[in-house]
Amino acid sequence: MTNPRMSMYSLASEAPGGNRGTGQQSTQVSTTTLLNAIHNIYLSAQPYRLDAGTSTVVNTWLTASQTGPNGSIGGTVDASLGASAWEHARRRAEDGCIVLGSLHESTPSVLAPFLSSLPMSTPSSLYKALDAIQPFLRCSTPYNPSTPRQAALGVTLTINLAGNLTAASIALSQGGIDTTKGLMNIPSEAGYRAFDVFYYLLTSASTPAEREFLGLKPASQYALLARSGTYDPPSYLPTADDAAAAEDFRTALKEIGIKGASHRSFISTLAGLLKLGNTLDYNVDEDVLEDVCEDVSGLLGMEPEVLMKQCTTEDRSTFVGGLYEALVDWVITKANVAIAAQMARIKDGAESLDGRGVRTPTSNEEGEDTVCISVIEIPNPTLGKALALRGIFDDSMGINSEMIADGIEVPATGSSVLREMQNAVAEVAPDLGISSTPASRERQHELEKREEILEKIGLSADDDGFIKQLLFPVAGEGINLGTHSRLDLPALLASSRVWYHLSLHPTDDSPASLAALPSVTSAWSAGTVSRQLRAWRLPEWANRRNKNLDFTADFDVEEFVQRYSALGCKDGRDGIETWLLERGWSNGEVIVGKERVWMRESAWWEAESMLDLKPLNNLPGVGNMMAVNQLESGYSNNGSGYFPGQVILDDHSGSNGVVNHQRNFSHGNMSQATFNQNPVAAPSIAPTRMTGMTGMRNVAVGDYGLGHKGDTHKGAVYYNEDGEFIGPLDPELANGKQIETKSLPMKRRVWVFIVWAFTWWIPSPLLRYVGRMKRPDVRMAWREKLVLCFFIFLMNALIVFWIVAFGRLLCPNFDKAYSQKEVDTHQGQSDFWVSIHGKVYDISKFWKQQHSDQDIETTRENMLPLAGMNLDDYFVAPLPLTCPGLDIEDTFRLDLNNTLEFQIADHTSGYYQPNPATKLRAADWYSKRFEPRIKEYFHGDLVWSKGTVRKQGENDGRQWVIYDDKIYDLTNYFYTQKRLKNLGGSNFLNEKLINVIKQNPGADVTDQWNDILERAAGNATENQSAQNSMNCIRNTFYKGITDFRETPRCTVNNWLLLAFSIMLCAVILLKFVSALQFGSKRRPSPQDKFVICQVPAYTEGEESLRKALDSLTALQYDNKRKLICVICDGVIVGQGNDRPTPKIVLDILGVDPKIDPPALAFKSVGTGSEQLNYGKVYSGLYEFEGNVVPYLVVVKVGKESEQSKTKPGNRGKRDSQILLMSFLNRVHHRSPMNPLELEMFHQINNIIGVDPELYEYLFMVDADTSVREDSLNRLVAACANDGKIAGICGETALQNDEKTWWTMIQVYEYFISHHLAKAFESLFGSVTCLPGCFTMYRLRTADKGKPLIISDGVIQEYSVCDVDTLHKKNLLALGEDRYLTTLMTKHFPFMSYKFIPDAYCQTAAPESWSVLLSQRRRWINSTMHNLFELMQLKEMCGFCCFSMRFVVFIDLFGTIILPATCVYLGYLIYLVSSGTGQFPLISIIMLAAVYGLQALIFILKRQWQHIGWMIIYILAFPIYSFVLPIYSFWNQDNFSWGNTRIVIGEKGNKQIVAVDDEGYDPRSVPLQRWDDYAQANQLPGRRGGYPEKYEGEYQDQYEMDEMKSVYSSVRQGSVITGMQNRQNPYMPPQSPALFGTPSPGHMTRHSTMTGAGPFADPHLAHRQSMASMGAHDIQRTQSPYADYPTRSMGNLHGHASNPSLMGGNRSSTALGFAGGNRAAEASSSTFDFQRGLAGPDDGMIVEAIRTVLMEVDLDTVTKKQVRALVEQRLQSELVGERRTFMDRQIDHELANM
């Protein structure tokens, strides 16, 4: 090896040429990366290295109670972190501190498990001490069955430089214990308990003598314990038993020396505190107080007056808390004494634990150097967060300030992170020793007050009593509680090298719910874990540390030279730098500062490993680090018992020595698509169908490194055993016609049955040959259309029939009956009505004629006064003529009860006519001349209401009655009798009949008269008299008939119509009221939410496009927070355009015409092969009127086979919407993306400079719409004020309103549809149609961040490809915008969908009849089908009839009956104009009210111009309500059906056949996660680069004028096109991980200390020495940082990454090194490193097969499933010979079982 820079010791030497950068970690860690990694390590019970000094684990009480992968219990811990701290401490002779932080209040303690994982033996007394101490510190809460209440608990382990433990101690921090929440004032909610020790005291484990002495009662009798009412431990715990725990507790107390007298004093004090708690109520009774104090004083050894008289209630409360804390300090002191005693016995050899552990020989030198490793448990997430953030991000203190002072470039921390750190520190300032804050001063005041109270009570206690021992532990020092034997946490962290072990909790669910889960790791909430990651700023943490500050070792220059001189390092800075170059450490692995040398962990351990290879006599000593008894200790040359010495393969040493060395590679979350191939050669997908892709694994395998089974909503694929696609996305492949049969839903089956039931009589051959409908699905759609049109026609006919004819059927002569009041209204010259003897006559054509043969002229003056009158008294028939058989003389006549007002109109005929010359003189004039002539003008019957008849008969003396519904008025008859006194023949009528009238005036006498007539029938004379009298009454006294129009038969229809009219009017009125929104326009404050302005472009012209883009650019909204996203739906030349629409868009935006980015594959909404589409992405900045806004243009260009077609790439507006929605969905879920989406992400994230996940709103604007400047801000402000708003729209007006007649008739419709319909719906928060031309949707909920419009459910239903029925066609092909609103309402019924009139835009309306006809056909049909869908939704707001469901029904019904409405209006016009029927007053009033209220709306809004538009609209009403609906209904099936999928039968099942279509194979669109893709291509923006992405405000990361489009300006390395000549990226150096057999000096050593505590590995009771690990698998590294398969140097051609970032840094714990081969165990971990491109060898495959076969149920599993499980275990896709070998070996293993 001639080039020293290619040293075998440096991983950098294996990176191919090219720039190496600065050594910073290139991988950008994001929340998604961490979330995915942590989910995987949670499932596999593994830790995750965030950086070299930080590890994360996920634990619950359930996982902590299970046996881990290495056989230990207590939860997952990272043993390698402890090993790293141990190595640094002993090798560097520096103190270390391991912080066990908790990110969630529910995480279990890992203190004991972590201690047991350290690479040293620990005394059993340490674990017993923890068992004894923990009940004092922990209590049960609803969120954690064992919640620690201390600020921090530390275990300090003192080791010598050989790594042996020499001392151990336990201490609380000066923050003490939270006695308030743990004892004094526990929450009063169920589930909370006080400290466990009190319940142990009260259990039956106490002896009867103790209970009698202490006077213990049930827990409910103690105020301190009874607050929550919870006295038992959580029942979901498998070991929830206070009695058993109390027994273990008492045993632990004995082990640490608390027994006998000290135990009695101890429990007396506990009981005294418990009882004293009953005196802390301010309202306690005096007698109770005295009794309790008397009892307690005896237990505590003091006078009762001290507690009762000298102490207030507050003093006693302070005393209880302070004494308890002092008691805990005393227990800890006793524990430390016990630990020290055992350590002394071990050192003296006086104690051996009978081989239960390996004995660790200790040094006999008294003055040997020692260092301390402190393990600090900080259970409070707030305190832990403050300490951690300050240590990582605060550059003014700690190691960060030292590096800055030494000249190391430390990037400034983001302001949002600093703010969060400062807020966290301020919250716990007292615990950090910061005394300048109000909280600190308050804490100090409380401590001083506590000290005074404790001193007062303590001095009054017995001199030799236990209380004085507790309160005055050091004689002469007074009260020193909180300082004596406590840890100074800030000072400890400042003086030690800090390592972080962070515990996360997977869910916010209660611990009780975990017990019911199907598996230990079923509990998972990505939101919960993500919140913890973001709260602690772990992505920024990882990026900051790994890129710049991940130095774990630092030396003085002289110290560095002395340490590594044996490896060739020369004196001085120049010598060091030269040596670093020889090692290949020129990329930031080691940095030489002004005075110190800083090393990353990998470089440091590489150097230390090389030292281990050197002979003993060549090693320099550093102080006393190399003790004389090193070989005796069994450690390696460099003193390492954890890393065995390495075998040198030749005689050379130094940089040219050849060592069998391996490399560690991590794939983390990377897919196989990037791992197994050149990770830099990004795919450039041409618009053609490809079988493979550069940089991607061959798609024939079909899983893209993600497995055969993917996300069902994001590109799921399924394959059979031969690798052929069999999934549900599309059954058609390019292998001819295939038939697919699938069952139909019941609704569809019923509908098909109905269609055939109505259209069976139409033969299909007729449709096929005459109608030219060759396809069955087209014929079926025609039949469906016919049935729908029939139903629509039937409904319209029923409506017209109901309104017009139904009432007449029920009441035939309804319009032939008139009351006298109605007759009185007809008094015009051409409307001359009169009533005569119960009949109504219209003599309008008669009265002007000269009909008198006397001297009376027929003039207006004479005739018009008679109009509308009752003329009974003017036309009196002679009695002999009308009453034959009654012997009435010709000279007799009845006198009139009334005086004639107009004498000239008197038509007396017969004998009493005084003028002999007139024809009236004739006795038969009335019957022969008058009656025949007047019948010509008969118009109807005169009707009287029964109430009128009764009232006038009873009250007014009118002698009339009702007989057979006819009215007879005999008033003149009785008047004549009265005047003649019954003489002169005035009694000519039957007396019995007359008596009935006298007795019942105004009544119905039908029964009485019939009775008389029946009786008279037996007597001929009587019968003759009665019949003649009845005949006379009918002829002479007939007055009319009863008003039958008042009967139920005639009124029921009117009442029904009136009821519906009232409901409609109520809706109209409510709509009117909702539209009355007065007041000045509110001016919301400027908003700062990120918004994507989506503009789908199809065939619009340049003027429309420019208006739309300019209006969006000029919006009064932060330019950096809006993104214009134009999606061109195909390369299409619109009518009137001279170039394709995409070219117009790019020309407007100023994109360089030379730019031609690659076409990238994505899945479109289409059928068959049309699902495969290609698109191009452009980005840059657009400037208009000083506004510079970023834009993104996506052009759908189609496949190569489409280029000869007229519309390549065109898939419809819905596909354009889905393209962006799907992209944002995958951004939200961090899901694998297709190539087009990856490029979009890159352009937005890295070129434009905004993380796509920051966008919160999607603003949809059509390409022919211009938006007013303030509209977007108003929409966003409305959403910001109401977090329930999921969609919102504004008013859309016309910008070409005066262009043509066809635009004019639309102006008023647009206005009123918004201000009446949408304003009304907005009241309910349920706007049923958010127009696609001007609508904004919220992407995710404001509270929990759940996706809304980008949710899986909405996208899945909106992106349906099989649009094969008439209903689906109308929903998805015509009214996609309305259907999108329907889907949003369906999936999120409790969200609001609003309309605000203040937001305003203008759009271009159709200017020609043909375009208007086409538009309204789509609108009307889609409205009808969408409203039908809405009717089926269950969750619709409202109550009673006034619900949205009712309104939707009204709208649906109104749409369907539009033609009926027009016909009825025409009928009304005819009635009014012709006068052929009754005047429709109510209908006219309703119409006037409807349009009057509409007019009132724009009048009140001062929109005067709409008066004219309203008139034009009314004139065009027949077009809107008749022509357009009829045309639309009949053209429901007018679609372009295509020929890809043909429905050939729907008789219970549906069959689909592919015709001339190659089909869509999902493998043609590979999917890959952004983080993996970005890492593989060395791209920035791996989801963690912007601190504003998490909590806090957005920090602008760029200046707008500095942003360059990747295509419109300088060509950059696109993520998709890649760089043809790029080599593998630089790989940060890793540990060489040397291995070999042990040196002769390596011997098995035995220790008298053991980790056999409750958390130790039960399988490793006889644990081997760390020096005996040389027998490990030859393919395993033996670094403390990893234990994973490695490979030889010859295979190092793939991309490697820092394992701490990508999840590969997964070492087995120290407890897991039992020697032997652990290949199977390692391969089972998701985070074990792969063997690179070489793949797993035969042995690994065989081992994986055997493991899988042992785990599965052979009776149910298939070979395919076994193969998948084996590949999953191997984390590799086996192909070719490897696959064949696997299949053969599976068969072999099955045969041998």
From Swiss-Prot:
Q: How does it sit in the membrane?
A: Multi-pass membrane protein
Biological source species: Verticillium dahliae (strain VdLs.17 / ATCC MYA-4575 / FGSC 10137) (Verticillium wilt)
**Residue stretches making up the DEK-C domain:** 1735-1791
Give the positions annotated as glycosylation sites. Answer: N70, N164, N638, N664, N669, N897, N1019, N1023, N1421, N1534, N1705
Q: What is this protein called?
A: Chitin synthase 5
Q: Which residues cross the membrane?
A: 750-770, 786-806, 1056-1076, 1452-1472, 1479-1499, 1507-1527
Main location per the UniProt record? membrane
The catalysed reaction is: [(1->4)-N-acetyl-beta-D-glucosaminyl](n) + UDP-N-acetyl-alpha-D-glucosamine = [(1->4)-N-acetyl-beta-D-glucosaminyl](n+1) + UDP + H(+)
Gene it is expressed from: CHS5
